[in-house]
Design a protein with these regions (language model features):
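Structural signal for the C-terminal ends of transmembrane alpha-helices
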Residues: 88-96
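Soluble catalytic domains of enzymes that build or remodel membrane lipids, polysaccharides, and related
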Residues: 135-149, 160-341
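Residue-level marker for buried hydrophobic side chains located in beta-strands
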Residues: 128-130, 157, 265
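N-terminal signal-anchor transmembrane helix
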Residues: 100-146, 150, 197
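Metal-dependent phosphoester-hydrolase catalytic domains
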Residues: 3-88, 213, 256-258, 271-341
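Short acidic/polar alpha-helix capping motifs at helix-coil junctions
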Residues: 32-35, 49-52, 109, 135, ...
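Hydrophobic alpha-helical transmembrane segments
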Residues: 69, 98-100
């Protein structure tokens, strides 16, 4: 009796496979003998080509009109969302032209961002660093500090520190991090000795960047913390980022002048690695997320991360792993990395 059931089940599975194969062949036959399969969907095909051109030539989009180029580069990975839409529409339209055209932006997207989707992180590392924009209006600064301390980081950079809340962070982090320095609205906490802590002028008129020397068993490391000005999207002005861009240039100049060979930059740069306006910084440093990250590493907004505007960049240091930490009460996710010195 059991043999009969197994045979019937096997035969049923085989029949189902034959039916599926027959349906696929039927669809292919209809497409093959449809004289309009190459004529339909020209608008979809044109959309796919335009999408591909937008990704390839994004650097040519001018910033003179509302910083449109930087806005496009900030959300560049999300252009890939349109690829499956075009593919589905091409199938529904029964357009071979549109299907083939949709492969073009798909290949380009994979070339640009396919490597970021995979986990490139490794084991080990000499130093774990964390950066977090804690949000000036954070309703639970003490809880945020405890979570950051619980991450196991050796060095912690905090941005958007409200002056009245600095003592709260200092008390909550004191047991884990005996060395720290706060300059303006940014601060650095370390398990290792710190020296030469000072503000960095990024042309704002107040302090939102600093540097310090952290001495670890492998030697001295220059650690920079920066919070570049926010950008705004306005209906009458587009993507306003002039102040951010000027500050990025100043920060890049400060890093060029740095005398130590090992440099780590932690902070909220209010821009992605694709944003040309941050070239003064990104052209001389490596992103830990790009080199050794787990996924895209989107950090903002915390409720539904869509882009990575918080960065850990290094020079003379080898990234081992990079990732985002669980959310706190901030509107940004904390980001972390392990590096070899």
């Amino acid at each position: 009796m059991t043999r009969v059931d197994m045979t019937e089940t096997g035969n049923g599975g085989a029949r189902e496979q034959r039916r599926t194969g027959s349906r696929v062949r039927s669809v292919l036959d209809r497409w093959r003998h449809d004289p309009g399969v190459w004529r339909r969907g020209t608008l979809l095909a044109a959309s796919a080509v335009l999408l591909a051109l937008l990704m390839v030539f994004h650097a040519q989009i001018p910033n003179k009109i509302g910083n449109l180029g930087s806005l496009t580069e900030t959300f560049l990975p999300w252009l890939g969302v349109f690829i499956p839409v075009i593919l589905v529409a091409a199938v529904l339209r029964r357009s071979a032209t549109a299907l083939i055209a949709a492969l073009l932006p798909g290949v380009i997207w994979l070339n640009f961002f396919g490597g970021l989707v995979t986990d490139k992180s490794g084991a080990g590392g000499d130093l774990m660093v964390v950066s977090h924009n804690v949000n000036a209006d954070n309703p639970d600064p003490e809880g945020t500090a405890r979570r950051i301390a619980g991450s196991g980081a050796d060095v912690v950079a905090l941005e958007e520190l409200k002056p009245g809340m600095v003592p709260v962070y200092e008390r909550a982090l004191a047991d884990t991090y005996p060395y720290h320095s706060v300059q303006g609205t940014v601060g650095l906490w370390s398990k290792h000795p710190m020296s030469d802590s000072r503000p960095v002028d990024i042309r704002l008129g107040w302090t939102r960047a600093m540097r310090a020397t952290v001495t670890v068993p492998q030697g001295e490391v220059a650690v920079y913390v920066a919070h570049l000005p926010s950008v705004r999207v306005k209906l009458n002005a587009g993507f306003t980022a002039n102040q951010r861009d000027d500050s990025a240039d100043a920060l890049g100049e400060a890093i060029v002048r740095e005398e130590l060979g090992k440099v780590i930059l932690l902070g909220d740069l209010n821009g992605t690695m694709n944003d040309r306006s941050l070239n003064a910084v990104t052209s001389q440093m490596r992103s830990t997320q790009g080199a050794a990250g787990d996924g895209m590493g989107f950090s903002w907004p915390a409720a539904f991360p869509m882009t990575r505007i918080d960065q850990i960049l290094v020079k003379g240091v080898e990234p081992v792993a990079s990732w985002t930490l669980p959310a706190t009460e901030s509107d940004h996710l904390p980001i972390a990395a392990r590096v070899t010195l």
